[in-house]
């Protein structure tokens, strides 16, 4: 089922029937792109200044109405806003006419009217009344910010809403050069011809079955496309320049994530080391001790601690912590000499 494009109500007199509107048609036209045969890149469109032949940026394009030769009235967004009709969310029935009296070329786009649960009774009442009287309802409805004239018709169990062209949008038939239908005139039809044509019409008459009629041009073209696909006669599309940048942008995002992850890991490592300074200091002393002979370890303990402090680049506050140990060592040496 097609999607709902509008919600509102049918109104006539004091009757209000809640309904939704669904498209009753769909386009089956093949979507073909324009390509440059040299590299199979898509071909875009540009807006060209007809005087200079140069492309025009969007910011410099305005809309204007030509009221005389080379004379224009410019229109801005405010002009269009003031011209827009208010969306009333109603299908306002203004009159009923004989359904057979509407010329088919007035019809434009068909829609299905479907009642919601609150409107089922009123919908059935309007449908049955129009069916019995053979009438069509003429209504006004606002769709996509534009007011439309519409004809509501009975079709099976449903009510169908056809948007219509206004009278000034339809060219008058009087402008055509048509033969007179008077029998016996050179431009008219003779009785014998009418009789034979009537017999031919009867022989060709059949029930209306729209499924048996198809767009043969579309079907043949689609069959040709499928043949080319099956035989491998396809071409790789060259992506536009802006699409080529997409992978590089993705790579930058991935690299940034990797850098952030490394930064978080380094930050966690530093936090862990700051929380356990004693454990970090001890391995440094042991490593220095393993590099020195046993005799030198006993002879110069202060120098080793100073070297260890230099390697680990301690803050001033932590370097000062070695001073008491050095003074204690000197004091112990003096006491030994005194003894």
From Swiss-Prot:
Skewed-composition ranges (Basic residues) = 278-289
Q: Name one GO biological process term.
A: DNA recombination
Single GO molecular function = double-stranded DNA binding
Query: DNA repair: is it a keyword of this entry?
Result: yes
Q: Gene3D superfamilies from the entry?
A: 2.40.290.10
Residue stretches of biased makeup (Low complexity): 290-310
| Pfam families the UniProt entry points to | Ku
Region feature (Disordered) = 230-251, 263-339
Q: Hey, which family's this protein in?
A: Belongs to the prokaryotic Ku family.
Q: What is this protein called?
A: Non-homologous end joining protein Ku
Q: Which organism is it from?
A: Cupriavidus necator (strain ATCC 17699 / DSM 428 / KCTC 22496 / NCIMB 10442 / H16 / Stanier 337) (Ralstonia eutropha)
From the broadest rank down, the organism's phylogenetic lineage runs:
Bacteria, Pseudomonadati, Pseudomonadota, Betaproteobacteria, Burkholderiales
Which gene is transcribed and translated to give this protein?
A: ku
């Amino acid at each position: 089922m097609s999607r709902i494009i509008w919600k509102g109500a049918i109104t006539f007199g004091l009757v209000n029937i809640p309904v939704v509107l669904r498209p009753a048609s769909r386009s089956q036209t093949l979507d073909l792109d324009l390509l440059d045969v040299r590299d199979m890149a898509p071909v875009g469109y540009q807006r060209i200044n007809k005087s200079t032949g140069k492309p025009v940026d969007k910011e410099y394009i305005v809309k204007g109405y030509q009221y005389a030769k080379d004379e224009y009235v410019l229109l801005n967004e405010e002009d269009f806003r003031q011209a827009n009709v208010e969306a009333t969310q109603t299908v306002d029935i203004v009159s009923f006419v004989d359904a057979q009296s509407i010329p088919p070329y007035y019809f434009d786009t068909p829609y299905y009217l479907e009642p919601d649960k609150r409107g089922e009774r009123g919908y059935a009442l309007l449908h049955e009344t129009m069916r019995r009287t053979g009438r069509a309802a003429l209504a006004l409805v606002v769709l996509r910010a534009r007011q439309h004239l519409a004809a509501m018709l009975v079709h099976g169990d449903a009510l169908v809403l056809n948007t219509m062209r206004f009278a000034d949008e339809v060219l008058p038939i009087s402008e055509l050069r048509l033969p007179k239908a008077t029998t016996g005139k050179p431009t008219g039809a003779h009785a014998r011809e009418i009789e034979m044509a009537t017999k031919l019409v009867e022989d060709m008459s059949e029930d209306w079955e729209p499924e048996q009629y198809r767009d043969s041009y579309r079907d043949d073209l689609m069959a040709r496309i499928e043949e080319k696909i099956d035989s491998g006669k396809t071409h790789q599309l060259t992506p536009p320049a802006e699409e080529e940048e997409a992978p590089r942008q993705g790579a930058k995002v991935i690299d940034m994530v990797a850098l952030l992850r490394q930064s978080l890991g380094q930050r966690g490592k530093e936090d862990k080391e700051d929380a356990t300074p004693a454990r970090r200091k001890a391995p440094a002393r042991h490593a220095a001790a393993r590099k020195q002979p046993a005799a030198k370890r006993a002879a110069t303990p202060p120098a080793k601690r100073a070297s260890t402090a230099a390697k680990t680049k301690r803050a001033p506050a932590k370097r000062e912590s070695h001073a008491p140990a050095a003074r204690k060592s000197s004091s112990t040496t003096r006491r030994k000499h005194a003894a």
